[in-house]
Amino acid sequence: MTGNDILLWDETLFKDLSVLEPDYLPEYFPHRDSQLNALRFALRPSLRGMRPLNCLLVGPPGTGKTSAVMKVFREVEVHAPGVVAVKVNCQIDSTRFAVISRIYRQLFGISPPNSGIAFRKLFETVVNFLVSSEKVLIVALDDLNYLCCEGHANEVMYSLLRAHEQYPGAKIGVIGIVNDASDLYCLDSRVNSVFLPEEISFLRYGEAEILDILKDRVKYGFYPKVISDDVLELVVSYVEKTGDLRVGIDLLRRSGFNAERRGSRTISSGDVEKAYEASKLLHLCRGISLLSDSEKQLLELIAKADDVKAGELYKSFHELTQLGYTRFYGMVNRLQTLNYVDADFTGKGKRGRTRIIKAKYEAEDILNCLKKG
């Protein structure tokens, strides 16, 4: 390393570190035009003071669902002062009271009383304000399946979707965000009959799309010539392995720190590999933590069994959970979609083709993540 290659103590590789933060919302949002336009169309009635169409955004983690909602919400805030758009993280706000409290805070700028107020009174305050001020409310329920896990999905959805029946003039639309439509198995007929969402699919990004998006982050996040095309291709390969674009953005950030720690003006492949080794379990564990208890139990059985036939796996799973084959089949497909398992048909079983299921990660890594919750 020559003198010109050495990064001085008061210098940095980052032109704008915020571009590489997980909550950064880029102006340029490539490869999601059809999804953005579908979402805009569904919300268009709210710009005219009408109740919008309900939506369900479906796709694996790291495919831009939440970012798409936040981008359109930002547009709504600029062009439609009569619309209130609220995003609720259902991992955090997982009860009916917590969801309405989040909406209350956005409407009034303060938190509701911690105790001594009933849900009905709180909800009435929110809806009466919307009616009297002639505002339309759009609620995005991010990770809506967590309300299912906690047993509150139906009461939350029913309260929001049927508010206009009890409070004439109330105009509320709901956007559900989930990894898989089967996550909403808990919704009953009362809710489904009024939810009737426009489903918007977010497929995994392809290799070229991942490269395009990461190039844009590199352009605005780093100074020129900090990362070469070859090193960026290595980052892309790790993103393809995990299926989560957020992994790539985090790797760029961590790799930059590694290069700075070495005092280098450029990011090396070693910086990327070191960053991935340090963070790979963080991303795996984060993803596993989002699974339902039953999905975690199934994944544990798969990890411990190595390669296992679907019939044998179902027998063990049913003994453990008492759940039926339909739920089991859906969970296997979901774990495959999330890139945790391979579940391919192979060979011949007693009654035709059989499915061999195996984990895509080291069993030890999966089990360690499951222990962490």
From Swiss-Prot:
Gene3D superfamilies: 1.10.8.60, P-loop containing nucleotide triphosphate hydrolases, Winged helix-like DNA-binding domain superfamily/Winged helix DNA-binding domain. Belongs to the CDC6/cdc18 family. It comes from Methanosarcina acetivorans (strain ATCC 35395 / DSM 2834 / JCM 12185 / C2A). The keyword Disulfide bond does not apply. Keywords: ATP-binding, DNA replication, Nucleotide-binding. NCBIfam families: orc1/cdc6 family replication initiation protein, PRK00411.1-2, PRK00411.1-5. ATP binds at residues 63-67, 205, 217. The gene is cdc6-2. This is ORC1-type DNA replication protein 2. GO terms for molecular function: ATP binding; ATP hydrolysis activity.
